[in-house]
């Protein structure tokens, strides 16, 4: 393998993390748009909206579970000074899981016809989820992109770990 190829491999993990975060941000924005369309009376029926939410929630949960079980232990081993950062990120994951559960519960009880009370509750939950997720991603990117770019984990090259997977037409999953 030439040096350029090796260098690209070494910088790819941080770049891949950023790509996953961009994708998850886009998924959340698309879900928010679908929720707004539903409450404005011209969106998906509740069943389809719940399926849309489930897709986003599953992707975010898979990403964070992959970090907690795979990436963070590897980073902690190689960079022990980041253990507090990783602990903070895990705490965010727990908070995001709780918010995802709240959103899913609200969407499970959506009426067939939108109503203002439900709209307010759902929009508040999406706003809270978005705020925590954005803050979490920015913090994680500032703390871990350069670290990930400095790492060479052969098994991550051979089998893309869950925290770096994207479900799309490019075949990332």
Predicted segment positions?
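Small-residue-biased structural context
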Residues: 1-173
